[in-house]
Amino acid sequence: MEKMENDQTFSGRFFRASDPEAWFKFTLFIFVFISAGLFSTAVAQSLAIKGKTYQLRFSDEFNGTAVDTTKWQFRTDSKHWSTQLPLNNVVKDGLLQIQLKKETVRNMAYTGGGLISKDTFGYGYYETRMMTPKGAGWHSSFWLMGYDGSGGTSPSNTATEIDILENDSKITLGYRTNLHIWKGTHKDVGGEYVSSENLNQDFQTVACLYLPDSLFYYYNQKLVDKKEIGSVPKSGLNIWLTCIASFLGGTEKVDDALLPSALLFDYVRFYTLKKD
């Protein structure tokens, strides 16, 4: 399978064993730095993908204490089995937590949540690192689609929908990619079932490279699906991070015993092709 490589390199000073005092000071500094919660992994400002350089255009590392509303708006619809609430989107401990609860709101027995980017994007590389909720009944998605400001999905406002990951939480060892055409008559172009590690036990990285003629899907940096999309209509796309209670995937009911639960995102990033 195809792999992508990060073009960032790291260089720095290394301490020799013959300089124990310097090594001790360096080790003590690192210990204090990490203990104080000041350590963070640098975000790659550029990536080398298929022989081309892509530059960071948008990112959220979720290192604050609340959702950054300069970047995001909230999903607030009632759909399938849940109502989506802004308060269920919590930023804490370096993660976006979309909290999932058993509570009745607007005649729905459960509440979910989601974020929708304020900006619209186009061709480039989209990536997130995420972990799905425990317990059956939840439809988690990392996807791209236009947005009309209504608080929910509106296919009439977009030409295409790109589903980078769709998972129904009763399934822990796989997910689906998908592509929909919404302009004119709806067409489900289809996708692939991707076998994975346990999605609710550890974080997994999922991504797609969106080009004018092709769409590449990646799981943990490995190519898992490809679509030829030269004839597919195009439109501006918002980034969606969402989780709703749903019957999708043949789900019969929500596993109440494992609630509350949460869909977790470590980060989301978008890179665009660097211009010569």
Predicted ranges, named:
Residues 1-46:
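Bacterial Sec-dependent N-terminal signal peptides
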Residues 45-276:
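GH16 jelly-roll
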